[in-house]
Amino acid sequence: MHTIAREPLAFAPVEHRFEGHAYTLGIEEELMILDAQSFELVNAIEQMLEAAPIGEIKPELMESVLEISTDPCANMTEAGEQLRALRRRVAATAAGKELAIGSAGTHPFAMWEDQRIVARPRYRDLISALRFVARQELIFGMHVHVGIDDPDKAIHVANGMRIHMPVLLGLSANSPFWRAAPTGMASTRTPIFRAFPRIGIPPSYENWEDYERRIEFMINAGVIEDYTYLWHDVRPHPKFGTVEIRVMDSQTHIEHSLGLAALVQAMVKELAEHFDAGRRLSSYPWEMLDENKWLAARHGLEGELVDLPSSDRVSTRALAWRLLDRMREHATDLGAVNELDAVEELLTRGNGAARQVVVYEANHDLREVMAEIVAATLA
């Protein structure tokens, strides 16, 4: 039998902007659009877009969700000023429509069946492709972009961040309720989003060329349109020249958003310097990365994770303290060490999920939980 020689598939390079200033920062938050009295979700994104300055608010999949995002910022001070101003302005826009905004990983008592899909081709195509999986994606996340000045370095940083996704999730978990009931999860957002394809802890890439070839293979196969259809917890973002961290629930208190962003920025700096020094990353089984993520989603800071270098079970809180202490020097270099005080507060007073549960346990009233979320979102 003769085999037919085949030409290798041609792969077009993925255009990128990994060439600017390192450690620039961008923060994105997905927020709820609410009735100001009942705190129920309202399908009002078009009203908000009409009333807000162009570009200040962006739509998401559902009409009851909006996104705000900072510009690429030189440092945490600039990012904090922008994010605070954005929350204030969006809240004022909402108030003018007898609406309010709130920030958490899920709405405690909303039903996805009541939400309308935004009339944009990308979202209609997403519903057509994913059906129920996309229709029930009524969740709210926070994304942090950190600038990287070299494409191979971006891959190294993204690979190195994978092991830390569970700790970041434990710190940020802020969604213990879903469809008017406690779920027993610290981050209910996580299993809801897990139903999507191309999600969760990503694969490890050898270098930028390996990433390019694998992305282009999927595009040529017709399964994705471009790399933005990979919704992994951490990913290179070639268009922006950043590494993007996507694992975290939206934070109710803006100080926690900024503290977590400062922590991420410091972690990226550590890994970028690791690359510059020619050091290699330790390799751990993907199954254990994924297991740790599940444990963080289930228990938040109250459980244990597997410390992968030692294979020992260690409290999530202890691992988070260890990470935080190691990042202080990097955050100091970046002018962001004061923002880490908010991460300390998460560790000492509890994350958003724990705080929601405390409010709920007083009267078992989820509207009280939402009232607390709305008030704290604007504090």
Predicted regions and their residues:
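Helical (often loop-to-helix) elements that flank the catalytic cores of nucleotide-handling enzymes
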Residues: 120-127, 148-169, 252-268
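Short, glycine/charge-rich beta-strand/loop segments that flank catalytic centers
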Residues: 98-115, 178-183
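Short, low-order "capping/linker" segments at domain edges
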Residues: 112-124, 183-199
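C-terminal accessory/tail domains of diverse enzymes
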Residues: 1-97, 126, 193-379
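Acidic, His- and aromatic-enriched active-site or binding-groove loops in soluble protein domains
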Residues: 120-140, 204
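Coil-to-beta-strand transition motifs
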Residues: 137-139, 152, 238-242
